[in-house]
Amino acid sequence: MSKIRVYQLAKKLGISNKELIDKLKELSIEVNSHMSTVDNENADVLIELFTEQNKEETKPNVDEKPPNQDTLTDNVNESAESIQNVDKKHFKKEINSTKNVTPNGNNKKDKKKKNKKDKRKNYIANNDVSAESKGEQVIQLKNKLTVKELSETLNKSASEIITKLIGLGIMATINQELDYDTASIIAAEFGIEVEPMTDIDAEEDVFDIIIEPDKPEDLKHRSPVVTVMGHVDHGKTSLLDAIRKTKVTNSEAGGITQHIGASEIKVNDKKIVFLDTPGHEAFTSMRARGAKVTDVAILVVAADDGVMPQTIEAISHAKAAEVPIIVAINKMDKPSANPDRVKQELADQGLLIEEWGGDVISVPVSARSGENIDALLEMVLLVSEMSELKANPNRKAIGTVIEAQLDVGKGPVATVLVQNGTLFIGDSVVIGNTYGRIRAMMNDSGKRVKVAGPSTAVEITGLSEVPEAGDQLFAVDDDKAAKAIVEKRINKIKEEQLKAGQKISLDALFSQMEQGQLKDLNLIIKADTQGSVEAVKQSLVKLSNDEVVINPIHGGVGGITESDVMLATASNAIIIGFNVRPTSNAASAAKKENVDIRTYRIIYKAIEDIEAAMKGMLDPEFVEEELGKAEVRATFKVPGAGTIGGCYVIEGKILRNAKIRLVRDNIVIHEGSIDSLKRFKDDAKEVATGYECGIGISQFNDLKEGDIIEAYHMKEIER
């Protein structure tokens, strides 16, 4: 040991903490309390000094009679018994269990004190209780424990513990939780040495068994998992559509895939699993996650565009994951297609095509006409056969979450790719910081299945919470084991949280940066799906610079709630909402606590706003002013007018010329304008709180009972 605490040294020397502190101050050694440390050099000097003093003190007195032999024997026996009974939980000072009786029966204070010192010295000398040997007697304490647990661990009564806590200015009850620092101070007050518990976590015990290598004879061939990568608008989803013969592209806003999907197809009685990762740079983290679970990467490059920035990034991800790449040169039906230029640009990035003497397979295809799609699939099967993909179906399942979201009817739902083992309905699982029992499984066709083997993508329900996209799934023995693992993980996270400070907004960001007041910009990100949360998070983190670090402290699925606002208040954070809205309580709390909430439908706008704020150029001319809210309580189909919502105005007022957004379960479904606003059969300019009305939304008919229509307008503010 390089240093020793004051109370440990005092115990070793057989004196009180106060005496030792006074002595240290006399020797100009700075200490503040019994928990302060003294280096070995100074400790040796003190030991030598006190040893000399004790020698003078304990010179034999000729007039004093020797102690009674029986008393000495009793003392020695008691000391020996005390030493033998020392353990981690019930370590007591030997000196407390030994009676100090003088030969003539006198109980004089000075002799009692002297006997204590002698016994301490004898104990140290005879039993070599050094700092090192004490290691066996150190009690291990958990990071968090109650007063009752501490009293049991230290073998002291709860009232003694509470008395010590009151002495420290802490008013506690028997069930109050204490942290390790407080508990260690209490232990030191009783002269008991403690250290943090370093036991093996339950999850390590469980996962060591789960991740045990499979025996070669148990391994069987499994289907390949393919990720389609490439630059935005190069035709990844269209290529998958051609393969699956579906039309996903038409349903995606702006033709850009925003959520990961997984699908299975059969080619010559062999199965291939496709992961459709989004192509835009904003979803880099989702694409990186796809590369981790994939066996083959299809790199889509448009024959007329060539290699683009996100193409290079996709190559990097595939190479980092050591995934074999097949290049699909798409849009070959276009007159401007130039495959040779594409091959040259790929060679510049380290991908040398086979026909040019390299080892990368390339297939010219057309997603629109279906040209060479079969050849591409044959190449996928060929590459997967060369990779010898195997898994053990006869073990507990291991998999990865591809996508996760909160479904109104089903609760937390996760799309999982089973990578090893077999997942059954009724299995207890741990996924990241959540757990559950599999209630139902659906394949990519929407059919219920009872079993999911290796290389199978299924949607599962029965989880306690929405997991993180990219979390690993482990099947465990039972719910009890799953819950224990998750509780340990959550406790670790809780121990690392909570900050406070001055409120921050985007408008004041640059001025605080200039004054040096702001070093971290804390963000809370809420979105409609977990994949979107990750995408927004990764995009904003990239904006960090030398002056300010973008720090997403929390991300979640669903609307912005009051608890999010409270976290923002405590953490000095800005709330970013992507495709979600704040609840009424959250909006009120944000106004009261002066928390900045920014909501976006397009990810680029969020990036632009924060970038502009960091450069000091954010000068908003318009702000959104909420006018009112109406709840849809019935729907009516009117010929020529579409679907009309029978609404009740629950807040503010609805204006005929206002802009509106339709919110369902705190997620924005549509933004637009009011087509018609009526009270009974008459047109109305506005409808106030507490009145019913009929609302028709321009070019939108998917109204449902329970939807909230929010009316607002953009108000110009003074610069």
UniProtKB/Swiss-Prot annotation:
Binding site for GTP: 230-237, 276-280, 330-333
Positions of the UniProt region annotated as G5: 366-368
Biased composition (Basic and acidic residues): 54-67
Domain tr-type G: 221-390
Positions of the UniProt region annotated as G4: 330-333
Chain spans, region Disordered: 54-75, 97-122
GO MF annotations, alphabetized: GTP binding; GTPase activity; translation initiation factor activity
Pfam short name (any one): GTP_EFTU
The entry's keywords: Cytoplasm, GTP-binding, Initiation factor, Nucleotide-binding, Protein biosynthesis
Region (G3): 276-279
Gene Ontology CC: cytosol
Region of interest (G2), residue spans: 255-259
Listed Basic residues bias regions: 109-122
Highest taxon above the source species: Bacteria
Functional summary from the UniProt entry: One of the essential components for the initiation of protein synthesis. Protects formylmethionyl-tRNA from spontaneous hydrolysis and promotes its binding to the 30S ribosomal subunits. Also involved in the hydrolysis of GTP during the formation of the 70S ribosomal complex.
Family, similarity comment: Belongs to the TRAFAC class translation factor GTPase superfamily. Classic translation factor GTPase family. IF-2 subfamily.
Name of the protein in question: Translation initiation factor IF-2
Organism field: Alkaliphilus oremlandii (strain OhILAs) (Clostridium oremlandii (strain OhILAs))
